[in-house]
Protein backbone atom coordinates (compact mmCIF):
# COMPACT_ATOMS: atom_id res chain seq x y z
CA UNK A 1 0.00 0.00 0.00
CA UNK A 2 1.31 3.43 -0.96
CA UNK A 3 2.03 5.38 2.28
CA UNK A 4 1.21 8.61 0.44
CA UNK A 5 -2.39 7.45 0.12
CA UNK A 6 -2.77 6.80 3.83
CA UNK A 7 -4.01 9.43 6.23
CA UNK A 8 -1.81 10.31 9.19
CA UNK A 9 -3.86 8.17 11.61
CA UNK A 10 -4.06 5.27 9.16
CA UNK A 11 -0.28 5.29 8.84
CA UNK A 12 0.06 5.14 12.62
CA UNK A 13 -2.54 2.38 12.79
CA UNK A 14 -0.76 0.35 10.10
CA UNK A 15 2.59 0.71 11.86
CA UNK A 16 1.13 -0.41 15.20
CA UNK A 17 -0.66 -3.39 13.68
CA UNK A 18 2.58 -4.42 11.94
CA UNK A 19 4.42 -4.31 15.29
CA UNK A 20 1.71 -6.33 17.05
CA UNK A 21 1.79 -9.03 14.38
CA UNK A 22 5.60 -9.06 14.29
CA UNK A 23 5.82 -9.71 18.04
CA UNK A 24 3.10 -12.36 17.98
CA UNK A 25 5.02 -14.21 15.25
CA UNK A 26 8.51 -13.77 16.68
CA UNK A 27 8.17 -14.38 20.42
CA UNK A 28 7.15 -17.53 22.28
CA UNK A 29 5.15 -16.01 25.11
CA UNK A 30 4.11 -12.36 24.67
CA UNK A 31 1.70 -10.42 26.88
CA UNK A 32 -0.07 -7.07 26.60
CA UNK A 33 0.05 -4.77 29.61
CA UNK A 34 -3.41 -3.38 30.32
CA UNK A 35 -3.48 -0.31 32.53
CA UNK A 36 -7.12 0.49 31.63
CA UNK A 37 -6.24 3.98 30.39
CA UNK A 38 -6.87 5.59 27.00
CA UNK A 39 -3.61 4.28 25.50
CA UNK A 40 -4.38 0.74 26.67
CA UNK A 41 -7.85 1.05 25.14
CA UNK A 42 -6.36 2.09 21.80
CA UNK A 43 -3.75 -0.70 21.96
CA UNK A 44 -6.46 -3.27 22.73
CA UNK A 45 -8.53 -1.98 19.79
CA UNK A 46 -5.50 -2.29 17.50
CA UNK A 47 -4.83 -5.84 18.72
CA UNK A 48 -8.43 -6.82 17.99
CA UNK A 49 -8.02 -5.41 14.48
CA UNK A 50 -4.62 -7.03 13.95
CA UNK A 51 -5.86 -10.55 14.56
CA UNK A 52 -9.50 -10.31 13.45
CA UNK A 53 -11.51 -12.52 12.99
CA UNK A 54 -9.44 -14.61 15.37
CA UNK A 55 -8.98 -13.94 19.06
CA UNK A 56 -6.07 -11.95 20.45
CA UNK A 57 -3.31 -14.62 20.66
CA UNK A 58 -1.86 -13.46 23.97
CA UNK A 59 -3.24 -12.55 27.40
CA UNK A 60 -3.64 -9.08 28.86
CA UNK A 61 -1.99 -8.36 32.21
CA UNK A 62 -3.08 -5.76 34.74
CA UNK A 63 -0.73 -5.10 37.66
CA UNK A 64 -3.25 -3.94 40.26
CA UNK A 65 -1.98 -1.74 43.09
CA UNK A 66 -5.32 -1.84 44.95
CA UNK A 67 -5.46 1.96 44.62
CA UNK A 68 -6.94 2.39 41.16
CA UNK A 69 -10.10 4.42 40.69
CA UNK A 70 -13.19 2.28 41.21
CA UNK A 71 -14.48 3.24 37.76
CA UNK A 72 -11.26 1.87 36.25
CA UNK A 73 -11.73 -1.57 37.80
CA UNK A 74 -15.39 -1.67 36.77
CA UNK A 75 -14.39 -0.73 33.21
CA UNK A 76 -11.62 -3.37 33.16
CA UNK A 77 -13.92 -6.19 34.16
CA UNK A 78 -16.71 -5.06 31.84
CA UNK A 79 -14.31 -4.80 28.88
CA UNK A 80 -12.80 -8.25 29.50
CA UNK A 81 -16.26 -9.79 29.63
CA UNK A 82 -17.40 -7.95 26.50
CA UNK A 83 -14.47 -8.95 24.28
CA UNK A 84 -13.61 -12.29 25.85
CA UNK A 85 -9.84 -11.88 26.05
CA UNK A 86 -7.74 -13.63 28.69
CA UNK A 87 -7.17 -11.18 31.56
CA UNK A 88 -4.50 -11.79 34.19
CA UNK A 89 -4.57 -9.63 37.32
CA UNK A 90 -1.58 -9.56 39.66
CA UNK A 91 -1.18 -7.85 43.03
CA UNK A 92 2.14 -7.93 44.85
CA UNK A 93 1.33 -10.26 47.78
CA UNK A 94 4.19 -8.93 49.92
CA UNK A 95 3.06 -5.37 49.33
CA UNK A 96 -0.53 -6.24 50.18
CA UNK A 97 0.60 -8.00 53.37
CA UNK A 98 2.64 -4.94 54.40
CA UNK A 99 -0.29 -2.65 53.67
CA UNK A 100 1.75 -0.48 51.30
CA UNK A 101 -0.10 2.77 50.70
CA UNK A 102 0.70 5.99 48.83
CA UNK A 103 -0.49 7.89 51.91
CA UNK A 104 1.53 6.03 54.53
CA UNK A 105 4.63 5.13 52.53
CA UNK A 106 4.81 7.85 49.87
CA UNK A 107 4.53 7.73 46.10
CA UNK A 108 8.06 6.46 45.44
CA UNK A 109 7.91 3.37 47.66
CA UNK A 110 4.30 2.64 46.72
CA UNK A 111 5.17 2.72 43.02
CA UNK A 112 8.29 0.60 43.46
CA UNK A 113 6.62 -2.11 45.56
CA UNK A 114 3.16 -2.29 44.03
CA UNK A 115 3.93 -1.46 40.40
CA UNK A 116 7.59 -2.13 39.57
CA UNK A 117 8.13 -5.16 41.81
CA UNK A 118 4.59 -6.37 41.13
CA UNK A 119 5.23 -6.21 37.38
CA UNK A 120 8.52 -8.09 37.66
CA UNK A 121 6.83 -10.76 39.78
CA UNK A 122 4.12 -11.26 37.16
CA UNK A 123 6.56 -11.38 34.23
CA UNK A 124 8.67 -13.98 36.06
CA UNK A 125 5.65 -15.99 37.18
CA UNK A 126 4.30 -16.47 33.67
CA UNK A 127 7.63 -16.45 31.85
CA UNK A 128 6.73 -13.74 29.35
CA UNK A 129 9.49 -12.92 26.87
CA UNK A 130 7.83 -9.83 25.37
CA UNK A 131 5.45 -7.32 26.91
CA UNK A 132 3.47 -4.69 25.01
CA UNK A 133 3.09 -1.30 26.66
CA UNK A 134 1.13 1.80 25.69
CA UNK A 135 3.86 4.38 26.37
CA UNK A 136 4.36 7.13 23.80
CA UNK A 137 7.49 9.18 23.10
CA UNK A 138 5.70 12.51 23.51
CA UNK A 139 4.69 11.76 27.11
CA UNK A 140 7.95 12.28 28.96
CA UNK A 141 11.64 12.86 28.19
CA UNK A 142 12.92 9.40 29.20
CA UNK A 143 10.24 7.79 27.05
CA UNK A 144 11.29 10.01 24.14
CA UNK A 145 14.51 7.98 23.80
CA UNK A 146 12.84 4.59 24.17
CA UNK A 147 13.11 2.17 21.25
CA UNK A 148 9.98 0.44 19.94
CA UNK A 149 11.69 -2.83 20.93
CA UNK A 150 13.17 -1.99 24.33
CA UNK A 151 15.67 -4.60 25.54
CA UNK A 152 15.53 -5.63 29.21
CA UNK A 153 18.09 -7.81 30.97
CA UNK A 154 17.42 -10.77 33.28
CA UNK A 155 16.54 -8.35 36.09
CA UNK A 156 14.08 -6.49 33.82
CA UNK A 157 16.35 -3.44 33.96
CA UNK A 158 16.55 -0.86 31.17
CA UNK A 159 19.89 0.56 30.08
CA UNK A 160 19.30 3.38 27.57
CA UNK A 161 22.89 3.01 26.33
CA UNK A 162 22.47 -0.70 25.62
CA UNK A 163 19.67 -0.69 23.06
CA UNK A 164 19.48 -1.91 19.48
CA UNK A 165 19.32 0.29 16.35
CA UNK A 166 15.99 0.23 14.53
CA UNK A 167 16.86 1.12 10.95
CA UNK A 168 14.13 1.08 8.30
CA UNK A 169 11.60 -0.26 10.82
CA UNK A 170 13.60 -3.46 11.26
CA UNK A 171 13.38 -4.75 14.83
CA UNK A 172 15.83 -7.06 16.59
CA UNK A 173 14.04 -9.41 18.97
CA UNK A 174 16.91 -11.82 19.62
CA UNK A 175 17.26 -12.48 23.34
CA UNK A 176 18.88 -15.00 25.66
CA UNK A 177 16.95 -17.06 28.18
CA UNK A 178 15.63 -14.86 30.98
CA UNK A 179 15.92 -11.64 28.98
CA UNK A 180 12.90 -9.88 27.52
CA UNK A 181 11.71 -7.11 25.26
CA UNK A 182 9.25 -4.36 26.14
CA UNK A 183 7.39 -3.37 22.98
CA UNK A 184 5.73 0.01 22.41
CA UNK A 185 3.41 -0.02 19.36
CA UNK A 186 2.18 3.52 20.11
CA UNK A 187 5.65 5.08 20.31
CA UNK A 188 5.07 7.49 17.43
CA UNK A 189 1.56 8.55 18.43
CA UNK A 190 0.83 11.82 20.24
CA UNK A 191 -1.83 12.49 22.85
CA UNK A 192 -3.86 14.30 20.18
CA UNK A 193 -3.50 11.32 17.81
CA UNK A 194 -4.85 9.05 20.54
CA UNK A 195 -7.94 11.19 21.12
CA UNK A 196 -8.66 11.66 17.42
CA UNK A 197 -8.37 7.89 16.87
CA UNK A 198 -10.64 7.15 19.84
CA UNK A 199 -13.22 9.54 18.36
CA UNK A 200 -12.98 8.19 14.80
CA UNK A 201 -13.04 4.54 15.87
CA UNK A 202 -15.68 4.99 18.62
CA UNK A 203 -13.45 3.33 21.22
CA UNK A 204 -14.87 3.02 24.72
CA UNK A 205 -12.92 4.77 27.48
CA UNK A 206 -13.16 5.13 31.25
CA UNK A 207 -15.70 7.93 31.97
CA UNK A 208 -13.13 9.69 34.20
CA UNK A 209 -11.57 11.15 31.06
CA UNK A 210 -14.73 13.17 30.48
CA UNK A 211 -15.58 16.21 32.56
CA UNK A 212 -18.12 15.84 35.35
CA UNK A 213 -18.81 17.26 38.80
CA UNK A 214 -16.56 15.30 41.13
CA UNK A 215 -15.41 15.56 44.78
CA UNK A 216 -11.81 16.78 44.90
CA UNK A 217 -9.26 17.98 47.44
CA UNK A 218 -6.48 20.40 46.56
CA UNK A 219 -3.21 18.90 47.79
CA UNK A 220 0.38 19.70 46.79
CA UNK A 221 -0.86 21.74 43.85
CA UNK A 222 -3.00 18.89 42.51
CA UNK A 223 -6.73 18.21 42.55
CA UNK A 224 -7.06 14.74 44.10
CA UNK A 225 -10.40 13.02 43.73
CA UNK A 226 -11.96 11.61 46.90
CA UNK A 227 -12.64 8.20 45.36
CA UNK A 228 -13.19 6.31 48.62
CA UNK A 229 -12.98 6.71 52.39
CA UNK A 230 -9.25 5.90 52.47
CA UNK A 231 -8.54 9.52 51.53
CA UNK A 232 -8.04 11.25 54.89
CA UNK A 233 -8.28 15.04 54.96
CA UNK A 234 -5.28 16.94 56.26
CA UNK A 235 -5.62 20.05 58.45
CA UNK A 236 -7.15 22.88 56.46
CA UNK A 237 -8.35 20.66 53.63
CA UNK A 238 -11.94 20.32 52.53
CA UNK A 239 -13.74 18.42 49.81
CA UNK A 240 -15.03 20.62 47.00
CA UNK A 241 -17.19 19.66 44.04
CA UNK A 242 -15.72 20.86 40.77
CA UNK A 243 -16.11 20.21 37.07
CA UNK A 244 -12.99 18.15 36.39
CA UNK A 245 -11.62 15.40 34.20
CA UNK A 246 -8.38 13.39 34.02
CA UNK A 247 -5.82 13.52 31.20
CA UNK A 248 -4.03 10.48 32.63
CA UNK A 249 -5.16 7.72 35.00
CA UNK A 250 -3.25 5.84 37.68
CA UNK A 251 -3.57 5.32 41.42
CA UNK A 252 -6.17 7.85 42.52
CA UNK A 253 -4.14 9.46 45.37
CA UNK A 254 -1.29 10.11 42.91
CA UNK A 255 -3.29 11.37 39.94
CA UNK A 256 -4.34 14.99 39.60
CA UNK A 257 -7.49 16.11 37.83
CA UNK A 258 -7.79 19.25 35.72
CA UNK A 259 -10.66 21.70 35.77
CA UNK A 260 -12.48 21.29 32.49
CA UNK A 261 -15.85 21.55 30.77
CA UNK A 262 -14.92 18.97 28.11
CA UNK A 263 -17.60 16.31 28.59
CA UNK A 264 -17.45 15.01 25.00
CA UNK A 265 -14.66 13.64 22.80
CA UNK A 266 -14.77 16.68 20.46
CA UNK A 267 -14.43 18.86 23.56
CA UNK A 268 -11.33 16.95 24.67
CA UNK A 269 -9.81 17.26 21.19
CA UNK A 270 -10.40 21.02 21.27
CA UNK A 271 -8.54 21.19 24.59
CA UNK A 272 -5.65 19.15 23.20
CA UNK A 273 -5.24 21.52 20.27
CA UNK A 274 -4.29 24.34 22.65
CA UNK A 275 -2.62 22.31 25.44
CA UNK A 276 0.93 23.40 26.29
CA UNK A 277 1.81 20.84 28.99
CA UNK A 278 2.26 17.07 29.08
CA UNK A 279 -0.45 14.85 30.49
CA UNK A 280 2.19 13.35 32.80
CA UNK A 281 2.27 16.56 34.81
CA UNK A 282 -0.80 15.15 36.53
CA UNK A 283 1.18 12.15 37.84
CA UNK A 284 2.77 12.64 41.26
CA UNK A 285 5.23 9.78 40.65
CA UNK A 286 6.91 11.75 37.87
CA UNK A 287 7.88 14.49 40.32
CA UNK A 288 9.51 12.37 43.05
CA UNK A 289 12.97 13.68 42.08
CA UNK A 290 14.86 14.89 39.02
CA UNK A 291 14.90 12.14 36.40
CA UNK A 292 12.51 10.04 38.47
CA UNK A 293 10.85 8.34 35.48
CA UNK A 294 14.17 7.27 33.96
CA UNK A 295 15.31 5.92 37.34
CA UNK A 296 12.09 3.92 37.67
CA UNK A 297 12.49 2.52 34.16
CA UNK A 298 16.08 1.46 34.89
CA UNK A 299 14.70 -0.47 37.87
CA UNK A 300 12.09 -2.27 35.77
CA UNK A 301 9.13 0.12 35.62
CA UNK A 302 7.29 0.28 32.32
UniProtKB/Swiss-Prot annotation:
Pathway: Sulfur metabolism; hydrogen sulfide biosynthesis; sulfite from sulfate: step 1/3. It is an enzyme of class 2 (transferase). CDD domains: Sulfate_adenylyltransferase_2. It catalyses: sulfate + ATP + H(+) = adenosine 5'-phosphosulfate + diphosphate. Keywords: ATP-binding, Nucleotide-binding, Nucleotidyltransferase, Transferase. GO terms for molecular function: ATP binding; sulfate adenylyltransferase (ATP) activity. GO terms for biological process: hydrogen sulfide biosynthetic process; sulfate assimilation. Residues 280-302 have a biased composition (Basic and acidic residues). Residues 279-302 are annotated as: Disordered. It holds the Pfam family PAPS_reduct. Its EC number is 2.7.7.4. Belongs to the PAPS reductase family. CysD subfamily. This is Sulfate adenylyltransferase subunit 2. The gene is cysD.
Amino acid sequence: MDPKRLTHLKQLEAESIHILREVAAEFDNPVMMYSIGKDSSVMLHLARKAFYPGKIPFPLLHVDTDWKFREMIEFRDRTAEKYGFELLVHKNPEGMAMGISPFEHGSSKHTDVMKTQGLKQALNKYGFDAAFGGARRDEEKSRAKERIYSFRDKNHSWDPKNQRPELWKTYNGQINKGESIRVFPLSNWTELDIWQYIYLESIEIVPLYLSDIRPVVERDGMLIMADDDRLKLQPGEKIEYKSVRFRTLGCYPLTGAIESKADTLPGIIEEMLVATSSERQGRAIDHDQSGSMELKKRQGYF
